[in-house]
Amino acid sequence: MDEEPERTKRWEGGYERTWEILKEDESGSLKATIEDILFKAKRKRVFEHHGQVRLGMMRHLYVVVDGSRTMEDQDLKPNRLTCTLKLLEYFVEEYFDQNPISQIGIIVTKSKRAEKLTELSGNPRKHITSLKKAVDMTCHGEPSLYNSLSMAMQTLKHMPGHTSREVLIIFSSLTTCDPSNIYDLIKSLKAAKIRVSIIGLSAEVRVCTALARETGGTYHVILDESHYKELLTHHVSPPPASSNSECSLIRMGFPQHTIASLSDQDAKPSFSMAHLDSNTEPGLTLGGYFCPQCRAKYCELPVECKICGLTLVSAPHLARSYHHLFPLDAFQEIPLEEHNGERFCYACQGELKDQHVYVCSVCQNVFCVDCDVFVHDSLHCCPGCIHKIPVPSGI
């Protein structure tokens, strides 16, 4: 009984004696402390990369969304469901920006069942449209982890061995209603090399801990909305690939976009293979991307040809995936007083006013904290190093 008060307070540890963090400066202001907290938050993600490790570049990810009655709770505003769907819209955009040759699918579980909101696809607009429509979804019943994971596994287990197979579960409930022993399913997921990660919205659940541990995934419980967004962002970058996963050359096609007009006598309207699966899209169109192997037409890339199975991509898609393999090294942090050069950021040309500046170890150019974060999060290459590369004389 003596341990009970201590155990009930343990989750509140991050909020104990918070006044000790705040320190006044000589003028009695707390501005310096607040700026330091914001600065550390900005710099945190710069160091969160895997380094020189093997990554699963071609990803197949199913996102399982809890649609049970607990999603109507209002601890996230306006409620858990609306907040989750908004954050997932942001996640889908970031996911395809950083993983353009990957695919994603969405599953909703409620009333002890699981149903697909979207199939595995590389089209972000399709997923975002479905997420916007799901705001009006009614939340009721209990979720079923077993049915959701079974549905995801039925598709993922047929994916090629050189791709990563992942499931991300947004779990709000503290219970799951399953038709069979979920621990047997966990063994099947592990055998199929499917990595399952969970983001909990309520509290830690034992079966989720076992699920993440056995499949090599992660399990976190959110603190607030900003922490929720941060946890989702962690799943944007590709995870390290297992050492025994297949490694082989992949055939890819690079179709050029053909533009045709009605005035062109040789132009012939044709069906897009993507339109054949949808009744809402127009049928016959001019131009598009034509598979170099079988000449099947598609309206956008990347896509896997439904006729010959060739992966169709563009060169920028591969370039945007390449930076994960060789992440930019973190810039060296030095106090502003120790910097003897110009007091201007090399990237934005703004005056350096922060207490610390950041120096590229290769080109020795200096950056402010905002440009440092932008370079590592979005640009993925140092502007100073690029400008030092000599341009061929023939160009």
Swiss-Prot record:
> Quaternary structure per UniProt?
Component of the TFIID-containing RNA polymerase II pre-initiation complex that is composed of TBP and at least GTF2A1, GTF2A2, GTF2E1, GTF2E2, GTF2F1, GTF2H2, GTF2H3, GTF2H4, GTF2H5, GTF2B, TCEA1, ERCC2 and ERCC3. Component of the 7-subunit TFIIH core complex composed of XPB/ERCC3, XPD/ERCC2, GTF2H1, GTF2H2, GTF2H3, GTF2H4 and GTF2H5, which is active in NER. The core complex associates with the 3-subunit CDK-activating kinase (CAK) module composed of CCNH/cyclin H, CDK7 and MNAT1 to form the 10-subunit holoenzyme (holo-TFIIH) active in transcription.
Alphabetized UniProt keyword annotations? DNA damage, DNA repair, Metal-binding, Nucleus, Phosphoprotein, Transcription, Transcription regulation, Zinc, Zinc-finger
* The UniProt record lists the keyword Cytoplasm: no
Q: Name one GO cellular component term.
A: transcription factor TFIIH holo complex
Q: Which BP terms in the Gene Ontology apply to this protein?
A: nucleotide-excision repair; regulation of transcription by RNA polymerase II; transcription by RNA polymerase II
Q: Which Pfam families match?
A: C1_4 (PF07975), Ssl1 (PF04056)
What gene name does this entry carry?
Answer: GTF2H2
Its job: Component of the general transcription and DNA repair factor IIH (TFIIH) core complex, which is involved in general and transcription-coupled nucleotide excision repair (NER) of damaged DNA and, when complexed to CAK, in RNA transcription by RNA polymerase II. In NER, TFIIH acts by opening DNA around the lesion to allow the excision of the damaged oligonucleotide and its replacement by a new DNA fragment. In transcription, TFIIH has an essential role in transcription initiation.
Q: What is its main location?
A: nucleus
The residue ranges of the VWFA domain are: 60-236
- Give positions of the C4-type zinc fingers: 291-308
Residues with PTM Phosphotyrosine = Y95
Family membership, please give it.
Belongs to the GTF2H2 family.
Q: Where in the cell is it found?
A: Nucleus
Report a single Gene Ontology molecular function: zinc ion binding
Name of protein:
General transcription factor IIH subunit 2
